[in-house]
Amino acid sequence: MRNYLPIFIIPVLASCTTMQPAKSVEVSEVITADLARADGSWAGVASISQRSDGVLLSLTAEAPAAGTYGMHLHALGKCEAPDFTSAGPHWNPNMKQHGRDNPMGAHDGDLPNVEAAADRKVTLEYKLAEFMLSGPSGLLDADG
C-alpha cells in the first residue's frame, strides 16, 4: 500500500566512489515551514534553499507509521487540512506525464519515494539541480 505525506519531501540518492574536495556553494535564499498532519499535530520541518548549484529540499519529519511514502511538489502554495487538496495538482511546468518512471518523462513534482523505519523518523536532503525558487517556471510564484 502506498502512503502519502501531505508535505513535500525528498531523499538524497547518491553514491561516492572517491573523495573529492568540497565545492563552494553559495546559498541565496532559505524558506522553512513547519509540517502538520490533518489533525494539526506537528509532523516535522521542511526547508527549501536556493543555491548556486540548484535548489536543495531538506526534511526532518515523523511519519504516521513505518513504510514507504510518496513525495510530490504541488502547484499551489496552499496546504489546508484535513485533506490537503488545496495544494492542487503536482507541480508540472513542463507539462510531462504522471509517474516517476513514466517513459514520457515525469512531472517535475514527482519525486522519489521515502522509507520511514520502525521509529517513523525521516531525515533527508534532495538536490534539484535544474530548478530555481523564482523566475520563469520557478517553484515560487504569486500563490507561494
Predicted regions and their residues:
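Bacterial N-terminal signal peptides
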Residues: 6-15
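Positively charged n-region of N-terminal signal peptides that target proteins for export
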Residues: 1-4
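N-terminal leader/targeting pre-sequences
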Residues: 16-144
